[in-house]
């Protein structure tokens, strides 16, 4: 609807547009897996009082202990992140939520990098980008250093997020060994429809 309105207001020929891209900071967005509604992540009680937000910004440094726990594993995938995972990445924030949220709420959450969340909001699909999953969520691309797994189940188990490996990493946006069955989305400006490619 927003795209259609922008095109109409500015008399832009839809055939001249080749794509729309989203960019965002390394922030974590959280939605309910069953209803797709935003899940409040501000804490401490996580009850939605109407003022809560479902995004933990990159500059939120609450997960100090969680980042330390992750880096203390010295897991091989950390080599691809400069030797350690930054507190500003999604995984320390997800682990912080697991350690602080009521378990029944955490168990219903699905997680996105903010740019991927914007794509999800715009399209309704569950695709994730390689940038988000590789650089911020512990996915090692198949073929890198002999990897054939992609998602690193042993890493998630070691840091206490083994429950996210169930359902083929669905809550993180993937299937076992693959980021997502369909990695990208396109918008058909002629028909005003989003399509998976």
Where are these regions (language model features)?
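Gly/Ser/Thr-rich active-site cleft segment
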Residues: 61, 71-197
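Short alpha-helix plus adjacent loop in nuclease-associated cores
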Residues: 52-70
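Short, well-ordered, mixed-charge alpha-helical segments that flank or form enzyme active sites
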Residues: 28-30, 66, 119-121
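Generic structural signal for well-ordered secondary structure
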Residues: 21-23, 48, 63, 90
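N-terminal glycine/serine-rich phosphate-binding loop of ATP-dependent small-molecule kinases
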Residues: 1-45, 56, 79, 107, ...
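Metal-dependent phosphoesterase core characteristic of DEDDh/y 3'-5' exonuclease domains
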Residues: 49-58, 125, 129
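A glycine- and small-aliphatic-rich helix-loop capping segment at beta-alpha/alpha-beta transitions
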Residues: 32-47, 128, 147, 151, ...
């Amino acid at each position: 609807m927003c795209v259609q309105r922008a095109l109409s207001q500015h008399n832009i020929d839809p055939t001249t547009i080749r794509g729309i891209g989203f960019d965002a900071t390394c922030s974590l967005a959280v939605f309910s897996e069953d209803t797709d509604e935003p899940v409040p992540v501000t804490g401490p009680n996580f009850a939605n009082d109407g003022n809560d937000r479902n995004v933990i910004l990159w500059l939120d440094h609450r997960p100090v202990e969680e980042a330390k726990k992750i880096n203390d594993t010295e897991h091989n995938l950390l080599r691809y992140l400069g030797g350690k995972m930054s507190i500003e990445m999604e995984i320390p924030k997800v682990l912080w939520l697991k350690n602080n949220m009521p378990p029944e709420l955490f168990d219903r959450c699905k997680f996105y990098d903010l740019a991927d969340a914007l794509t999800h909001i715009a399209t309704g699909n569950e695709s994730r980008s390689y940038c988000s999953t590789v650089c911020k969520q512990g996915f090692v691309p198949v073929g890198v250093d002999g990897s054939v797994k992609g998602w690193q189940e042993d890493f998630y188990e070691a840091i206490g997020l083994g429950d996210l490996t169930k359902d083929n990493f669905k809550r993180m946006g993937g299937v076992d060994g693959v980021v997502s069955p369909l990695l990208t989305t396109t918008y058909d400006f002629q028909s005003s429809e989003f399509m998976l490619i």
